C-alpha cells in the first residue's frame, strides 16, 4: 500500500473537514427551507443532472431488474459510473441500504 506524505494526509483531512462543513451548511439550509437555493448556488446544472442520474442508478441497482449494460443504455451514463455506484452500494452500511430501499422503492 502506498504511503501518503504528511502533506497529502493533511490535505485529505482538510478536504474532509470542508465536506463536513458543507454537509452542516446543507442541514442548516434544510431547516430554514433554503436548501434548493443553496444547491442551485453550489452546483452547476451539469452537477445537479449528474446527481439526479446517480440517484436513478442507485434506484435501479436496488430494484435489480436491469443489467448494468441495460442501465447504461437507459440512462446514458458510463459503465464506469454504474460500476462505481454498484460497488459503493455493496460497501454501504446495511442501514443506509435499507433506508434507500424504503425511500426509493416505496411506491414501485
From Swiss-Prot:
One of its GO terms (biological process) is negative regulation of DNA-templated transcription. The keyword Cytoplasm applies. SUPFAM superfamilies: TrpR-like. The keyword Transcription regulation applies. GO terms for molecular function: DNA-binding transcription factor activity; sequence-specific DNA binding. It is found in: Cytoplasm. It holds the Pfam family Trp_repressor. Residues 68-91 bind DNA. InterPro entries: Trp_repress, Trp_repress_bac, Trp_repressor/repl_initiator, TrpR-like_sf. Keywords: Cytoplasm, DNA-binding, Repressor, Transcription, Transcription regulation. One of its GO terms (cellular component) is cytoplasm. Belongs to the TrpR family. Homodimer. This protein is an aporepressor. When complexed with L-tryptophan it binds the operator region of the trp operon (5'-ACTAGT-'3') and prevents the initiation of transcription. The complex also regulates trp repressor biosynthesis by binding to its regulatory region. This is Trp operon repressor. It comes from Escherichia coli (strain SMS-3-5 / SECEC).
Amino acid at each position: 500500500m502506498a504511503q501518503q506524505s504528511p502533506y497529502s494526509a493533511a490535505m485529505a483531512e482538510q478536504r474532509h473537514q470542508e465536506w463536513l462543513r458543507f454537509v452542516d451548511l446543507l442541514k442548516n439550509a434544510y431547516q430554514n427551507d433554503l436548501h434548493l437555493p443553496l444547491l442551485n448556488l453550489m452546483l452547476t446544472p451539469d452537477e445537479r443532472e449528474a446527481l439526479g442520474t446517480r440517484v436513478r442508478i442507485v434506484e435501479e441497482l436496488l430494484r435489480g431488474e436491469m443489467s448494468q449494460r441495460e442501465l447504461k443504455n437507459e440512462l446514458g451514463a458510463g459503465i464506469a459510473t454504474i460500476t462505481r455506484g454498484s460497488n459503493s452500494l455493496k460497501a454501504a452500511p446495511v442501514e443506509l441500504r435499507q433506508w434507500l430501499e424504503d425511500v426509493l422503492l416505496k411506491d414501485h
